[in-house]
Amino acid sequence: MARRNEERGDRRNREEERDSEIVEKLVHINRVAATVKGGRRFSFAALMVVGDQKGRVGFGHGKAREVPEAIRKATEEAKKSMIRVPLRESRTLHHDGAGRWGAGKVMVRAAPPGTGVIAGGPMRAVLETLGVQDVVGKSVGSSNPYNMVRATFEALKAQSSPRQVAAKRGKKVSDVIGRRADGASAAQPAADAEG
């Protein structure tokens, strides 16, 4: 029995450690009203994005009569819905991608070192909490924060690392990224043959 309690304590400590590393960003807060027979009843809706800045990110939506409670609910939901996104060199995305949710469309592009996070509003919050340091993002269509966040997540879910692509195709990573054993790229022999 004592051992089980120790294990439970360890699990709680690990969860607390993991939570202490998580960065939380409030993307949007909205006052909503329900019309009831006595007039209007106001409540607040919060949209939060959380991430560990090491490739994990999640978003959540919370509603409550008070702002802090709405934020707490949104944060809890965001922590439960976290996804892992493979990052190249722990600083950028592996490839360009696009996502769509409703009328909101977003495009994300991998960028060279020193570019920074070039993205606006809700998209920027998602990419910063993910831990991306160099990326270019563009939003087209709806600027509704909920649609933008969801569209960004759709684009991020489509990201795959060379290792994942190689496993899916049943090949070696070096075959997928086009490198040969001698270090020349696969495109080199074709260029040599033409010239």
From Swiss-Prot:
The keyword Ribosomal protein applies. One of its GO terms (cellular component) is small ribosomal subunit. PROSITE patterns: RIBOSOMAL_S5, S5_DSRBD. Residues 183-195 have a biased composition (Low complexity). Keywords: Ribonucleoprotein, Ribosomal protein, RNA-binding, rRNA-binding. Residues 164-195 are annotated as: Disordered. One of its GO terms (molecular function) is rRNA binding. Residues 172-182 have a biased composition (Basic and acidic residues). Disulfide bonds: none annotated. Residues 22-85 form the S5 DRBM domain. GO terms for biological process: translation. The N-terminal domain interacts with the head of the 30S subunit; the C-terminal domain interacts with the body and contacts protein S4. The interaction surface between S4 and S5 is involved in control of translational fidelity. Part of the 30S ribosomal subunit. Contacts proteins S4 and S8. With S4 and S12 plays an important role in translational accuracy. Belongs to the universal ribosomal protein uS5 family. This is Small ribosomal subunit protein uS5. It comes from Phenylobacterium zucineum (strain HLK1). The gene is rpsE.
